Amino acid sequence: MLHRLLPLLLVLTVLIFVSLNFQSIRRDLVYKLGISGDPTTSCCKLEEISQSGDFDETATTAIFNGREVSYPKTSLAYGFLQSLTKTPSGEEGNILGTTNDAGEEKWIEISLDDQKVRAWEGSRIVMEFPISSGKWAPTPKGTFNIWYKTRSQTMSGGSKEHGTYYFLPNVTSNMFFHQGYALHGAYWHNNFGQPMSHGCVNAPLNYAAQIFEWAGPVLPPGVNALRASADNPGTRVYVH
C-alpha cells in the first residue's frame, strides 16, 4: 500500500517545495533567461560614481535584495575600518602603487570560478581572499586597469518586483576597473565565495580596505576620490 502512495507523496513534496520557493525560483529563471526587465549590469552607472568619495553622514537606511540591512552609520565606524588597513607585508604605506620596492609589477587576479581575489607582486601572491562576483548580471572578463577609486560610494539598482533591489550608502574601498564595475567592500552580506552581485566584485571589508590602499592609483592623505593618470596609474586587473 505504501509503495503505491510514494509517487503521490513525491509529487506533493515537489509542489510544496515549489510553492515555498516560488519567488526565488521565478527570480532565478527570469534572470537566467534575460527577461527580468532589470537594466542593472554593474554597481553604478558612470554618472553615479561619486566625485568626492566622502562618507554620507545623512544616510539612515541600507537595503539589499529588498530588505533593510545594518551598516556602519557614522564616519567614526568607517574610520575604524580604515584603521585596519595595512599592506600585505604588514607595513604602512611604503609599497603602494603599481610596482613594489623591488620593481615588480603589482596586479590583481579575480577568479570567477574560484570566487577569489589574488593580489600579486610579480609571480608571488601577497594576498588572497574570497569574493562574490556577478549573479544577476555577469562580471566582465578580460584585462583592465583601475581607472578610478572612491573611499565611499552610494550604490543602487536591481528590481523591486523580483526582490533584487538594493540601495547601499557608504560602500567602502571602491576600485572601478571597467566602466561602473568595481572591486569593493560589502557590509550587507557574509556569503563570500558565492556569486551575489549585479556584476561588481564584493569583498570582505577588511580585505577590501587593505587592497584599496595597496593598489594604484594612490590616494594622497585627505583625498577620497581619484582618477588614475600617467603619473599615478591604476593597477592591472585580470578577470577570468
What are these regions (language model features)?
Residues L2-G53, T139, T150, G157-H240:
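Exported/periplasmic cell-wall-interacting domains
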Residues I16, I25, I35, I49, ...:
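Weak global preference for isoleucine
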Residues R26-T99:
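N-terminal, intrinsically disordered, polar/charged segments of Gram-positive cell-envelope systems
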Residues G79-N191:
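Gly/Pro-biased beta-strand-loop elements
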